[in-house]
């Protein structure tokens, strides 16, 4: 199935980015409730008809925003330091970049992974495309440290689900009032240490090594 995401010519990219930046700002500042065509148009200083013209409506705008969010994640993963002789350390750097991305904008992360917009279901072809271009970063790093005969794709999936679980729980905990006698202190540093410990435990359990 073709995506609902509307393609544009290169000359339109600047205007398109302006609307997507506005949509990301609305999502961060006002949450999902503010993510309407009118809200995005107002933030971009444009009319609602302009948004409809460029994206075909709310679903087209959400598709484009969904795709843009994954573009930003991929850029962050690609921005980690160049590969070193320590493949495990390099993999851990990518995992840390993933957590930083999630913490930078929980609302954006929710749009990507948590179905936070209850009536929005990204087009399957669009989902397949963003997954293929983003999670290849994990597969590439894992390929360097996978034992012979072990599927790097399987390892990447298991590692990502662990990372996603840790991040999702952290976001939930940090959005709520702290309770006494919880497993760890309610600080970013404590959560960061637990995340690193969990990722390393999964790496070890998968038998990944330099």
Feature annotation, model-predicted:
Residues 1-14, 25, 84, 178, ...:
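N-terminal intrinsically disordered/low-complexity leader segments
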Residues 15-23, 40, 65-69, 73, ...:
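Generic hydrophobic, amphipathic alpha-helix propensity
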Residues 18, 26-60, 64:
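Helix-turn-helix
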Residues 27, 62-69, 112, 127, ...:
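Alpha-helical DNA-contacting segments of helix-turn-helix folds
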Residues 64, 78-108, 131-135, 149-159:
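Hydrophobic alpha-helical connector segments
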Residues 103-122, 168-179:
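Amphipathic alpha-helical segments used for helix-helix packing
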Residues 120-147, 153-157, 189-203:
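Amphipathic alpha-helical packing segments from all-alpha helical-bundle domains
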Residues 160-182, 201-210:
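Amphipathic C-terminal alpha-helical segment
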């Amino acid at each position: 199935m073709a995506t609902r995401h509307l393609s544009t010519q290169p000359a339109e990219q600047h205007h398109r980015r302006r609307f997507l930046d506005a949509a990301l700002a609305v999502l961060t500042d006002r949450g999902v409730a503010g993510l309407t065509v009118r809200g995005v148009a107002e933030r971009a200083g444009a009319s609602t008809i302009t948004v409809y013209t460029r994206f075909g409506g709310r679903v087209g705008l959400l598709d484009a925003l969904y795709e843009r969010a994954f573009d930003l994640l991929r850029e962050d993963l690609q921005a980690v330091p160049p590969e070193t002789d320590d493949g495990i350390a390099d993999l851990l750097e990518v995992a840390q970049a993933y957590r930083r991305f999630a913490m930078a904008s929980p609302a954006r992360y929710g749009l990507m992974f948590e179905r936070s917009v209850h009536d929005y279901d990204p087009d399957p072809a669009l989902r397949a495309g963003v997954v293929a271009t983003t999670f290849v970063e994990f597969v590439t790093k894992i390929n360097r440290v996978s034992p012979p005969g072990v599927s790097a794709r399987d390892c990447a999936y298991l590692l990502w689900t662990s990372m996603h679980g840790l991040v999702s729980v952290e976001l939930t905990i940090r959005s709520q009032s702290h309770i006494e006698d919880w497993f760890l202190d309610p600080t970013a540093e404590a959560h960061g240490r637990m995340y690193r410990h969990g990722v390393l435990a999964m790496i070890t359990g998968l038998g990944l090594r330099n």
